[in-house]
């Protein structure tokens, strides 16, 4: 049936009407009386009935429909249920069969015919082919590449972004190759990791803009929507991560505790004291450790290609998603002793703690044990050889948090005769892992065993600016670690 709609409009006489005029009750017109009732279409009291019914419904407050939608799933929703209620101690088989490693090694060292590679990069590719064939030991770049390739072959995606991550700040990666005969600067690139298998996961590598906060913030958000992709943000130097401190504090370290927002984001922060000054030495390990609680993050400082291989694979294969902060090396990228074999990848796994590697060191004769993390291990190793010391052992802590307490206690039992235990670190005493790790170490000690500190003195700056001063500090901390100099800090668990 047709219906008439009547509008009654009261003019407020332009915009400058005094406010007291429109506030007065100007009355209203009962349209129903004018039309419907007079024509016999509706009863005369119909409008009043509708008003009464409306007000009664409003007063009752009854919901006409269930405000909670059931069985609803947004098309953008991500299923995180497979990764809930898991633990960091859950086992993960990160080993890859030797034949598969060799196949992957061949694929990532194959380039298209006629592709002109830069001579220096060509040497890197040829060396990697020799590594895949077992003719050379694996270096850091190859361990990393095989980790990416194997993860991709397993169907997971890999996304790597940062200010210089295609090549790598220290030219160790070369994930993207460039044709030296290209006619245009923006063409002629080839990415071997995009060609490891027919049904592989997606590999993306992005040289980002020079903004740590913006890029890390984006990658954090991306990672919360991609549980099956290894999302990595790499800082040009670990020192520059402080430009994104808000993202680290507000989201990465505490997002799950505050909002239940899970992420498997990985941070690669180049860290190490090589005399490059206060802005290119420290990724501030102490700050990340201070943020750790309730198993909210994983803090790892790997020292071998096998370790970076297994920890990257563990991040995806294990049904456990927490942020992974990797303090990656700089000088170890080409260090002659920071190497691994294909067997280490094919048969091994990630080690929370790496014990003494020299079989000539007799645990029963060891009186002093040095515990450290990162690149300092290789300086200590070289100094021990030079001094021809066989009465001290060197242990590496590869995962700082969550701390492998049982693994460390096993090392303490192994050196039951050792009374002097030393934590040695590159960083100043008020920085680095010292204040965090000493409690874990002391909890494992028996009566009569004491803990000492060997490292740089407390400093407002992360590092000194002169190489000579840097080297003098290094010599002093090694002497302290070996017991040839007075320790800067001493605590004990001796009998009272």
Region roles according to the model:
Residues 2-496:
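Flexible, glycine-rich loop/tail regions that form catalytic "lids" or insertion modules at the edges
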């Amino acid at each position: 049936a047709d219906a008439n709609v009547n509008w009654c409009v009261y003019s407020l006489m332009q915009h400058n009407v005094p406010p007291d005029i429109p506030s007065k009750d100007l009355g209203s017109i009962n349209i129903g009386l004018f039309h419907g009732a007079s024509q016999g279409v509706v009863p005369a009291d119909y409008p009043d009935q509708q008003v009464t019914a409306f007000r009664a419904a409003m007063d009752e407050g009854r919901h006409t429909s269930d405000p909670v939608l059931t069985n609803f799933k947004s098309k953008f929703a991500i299923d995180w249920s497979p990764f809930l209620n898991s633990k960091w101690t859950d086992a993960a088989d990160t080993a890859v069969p030797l034949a598969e490693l060799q196949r992957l090694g061949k694929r990532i060292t194959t380039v298209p015919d006629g592709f002109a590679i830069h001579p220096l990069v060509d040497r890197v590719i040829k060396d990697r082919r020799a590594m895949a064939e077992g003719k050379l030991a694996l270096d850091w770049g190859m361990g990393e590449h095989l980790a990416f390739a194997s993860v991709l072959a397993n169907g997971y995606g890999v996304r790597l972004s940062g200010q210089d991550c295609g090549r790598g700040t220290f030219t160790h990666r070369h994930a993207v190759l460039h044709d030296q005969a290209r006619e245009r600067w923006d063409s002629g690139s080839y990415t071997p990791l995009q060609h490891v298998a027919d049904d592989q996961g997606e590999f993306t590598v992005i040289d980002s803009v020079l903004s740590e906060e913006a890029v890390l913030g984006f990658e954090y958000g991306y990672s919360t929507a991609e549980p099956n992709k290894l999302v990595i943000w790499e800082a040009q130097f670990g020192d520059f991560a402080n430009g994104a401190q808000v993202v680290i504090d507000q989201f990465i370290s505490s997002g799950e505790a505050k909002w239940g927002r899970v992420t498997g984001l990985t941070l690669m922060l180049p860290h190490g004291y090589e005399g490059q000054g206060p802005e290119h030495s420290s990724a501030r390990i102490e700050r990340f450790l201070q943020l750790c609680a309730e198993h909210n993050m994983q803090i790892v400082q790997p020292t071998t290609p096998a370790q970076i291989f297994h920890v990257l694979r563990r991040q995806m294969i294990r049904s456990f998603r927490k942020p992974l902060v990797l303090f990656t090396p700089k000088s170890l990228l080409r260090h002659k002793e920071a190497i691994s074999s294909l067997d280490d990848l094919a048969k091994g796994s990630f080690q929370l703690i790496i014990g003494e590697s020299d079989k000539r060191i007799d645990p029963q004769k060891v009186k002093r044990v040095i515990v450290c993390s990162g690149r300092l291990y290789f300086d200590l190793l070289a100094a021990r050889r030079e001094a021809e010391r066989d009465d001290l052992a060197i242990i590496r802590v590869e995962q700082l948090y969550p701390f492998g307490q049982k693994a460390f206690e096993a090392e303490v039992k192994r050196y039951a005769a050792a009374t002097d235990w030393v934590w040695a670190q590159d960083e100043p005493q008020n920085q680095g892992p010292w204040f965090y790790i000493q409690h874990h170490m002391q909890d494992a000690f028996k009566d009569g065993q004491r803990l000492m500190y060997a490292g740089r003195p407390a400093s407002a700056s992360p590092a000194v600016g002169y190489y000579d001063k840097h080297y003098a500090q290094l010599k002093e901390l090694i002497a302290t670690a070996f017991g040839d100099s007075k320790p800067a800090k001493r605590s004990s668990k001796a009998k009272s």
